[in-house]
Amino acid sequence: MAGAKLLRPASVAKVELSPGGLQTLTLRHGETTETVSARWIVDASGRAAVLARKQGWWRHNAEHPTAAAWSRWKGVKDWDSRELAEKYPEWATAVYGIRNTATNHVIGDGWWSWWIPLKGGDVSVGIVFDQRLVEFPHDEGKLGERLKNFLMQHPVGREMLADAQFEESDVHWRKNLAYYSTTFADDGLVLVGDAAGFIDPFYSPGMDWISFSASAAAELITAQRRGEPMAERIARHNRDFALSYRSWFESLYKDKYEYMGEWDLMSTAFRLDLGLYYLGPVSHIYKYGPRGLLTPLFSLPRSRPAFHLIRTYNRRFAQIARRRRRANALGKTNRGRRCLIPSFTLSRGDSRRLFGALAKWAWIELTEGWRSWGQRPQETAAASSVSAKDVAEETMVRSHS
């Protein structure tokens, strides 16, 4: 029988796995309990990661101890309002686009925040921070109040949230965001999306992760239905996704929060990250179509040079930022600077823009980075004494449509 049967609301009460055989689910649906058997189970349970936790595959990524707090707000100011334009003329003329219908990011030392307009005029505002670098207030009132107080240490947050009120029924906190599964598939089960792993919401990599993992899951299932041998396919699937997760984390995210609030370092990394993303994964998918989604990022040998390049400049920028932190020199190049760039496209000419970013990296190394050449990279320190207020006027605001 073709098609799909949707049960809603429903919850999984029990899972019985039989690799190579039929998998059995016990479901609670309304007032009834139902048992369903199938050759394959696809776990798309998100952060609940039902199968990874049940099988003991779930692991916390201790190298990336981020946390997040967020809420829905009323009364957030309009980024494009006449009030702000008259009060801050340079702010109003900095961009040609409309900020208020875009997702805006306000960034500081060890943290970043999102500002997402919602239907009806409300705004989702939240922060993500590295717990080794930022001490988020824990015992100073309601979570929404603490979130507002934290953001109001930044001049943009202070202006935008001056008259805003959080929705008390829609305030959230999540600790230790990053995790992964040590196994991504077996003969009869496959994990997709956040059920397989999560790194960081910055750059929204979850959209890529679900695209690659769901496409590869569908290919596994159809291969089995065609009668193909599964052992090597499943082994390769697990190998590819484990390598992809680790490479994605090490290249883009490991210790990135160390330099996130440094305009020169972060704006250079942003250009390189974005340009290489279009030059690599995006162009690959446009070239090969759906087949390009069957192999996750950084799992092919030809992608390893790009991985090493991205990991290298990310490590270097983190090390330079640590040296600045020790010298109490964070944010010294930030005042009056903003990172506003045209987006990349698939045009070959856009790849030339990468040379400018690479030249900027070289300049940073020659003028400052050389002081840490040959030094062993240090681990990110425990929570810094540098607060959001200390670098409030020396942080970067980024907005994109």
Cite the ranges covered by each PLM segment.
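C-terminal helical "tail/cap" subdomain of flavin- and related membrane-associated enzymes
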Residues: 220-396, 400
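FAD/FMN-dependent oxidoreductases across multiple families
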Residues: 109-113, 117, 131-220, 224-253
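Alpha-helix boundary/capping detector
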Residues: 67-68, 77-78, 177, 263-267
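Predominantly flavin-linked oxidoreductase catalytic cores and closely associated redox partners
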Residues: 2-157
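Intrinsically disordered, low-complexity regions enriched in Ser/Pro/Gly/Gln/His and often acidic
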Residues: 66, 72, 107, 166, ...
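A general structural signal for short secondary-structure boundary/capping elements
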Residues: 86-92, 161-163, 173-174, 236-238, ...
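Short, surface-exposed, charge-dense and proline/glycine-enriched linear segments
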Residues: 36-37, 41, 90-101, 188-198, ...
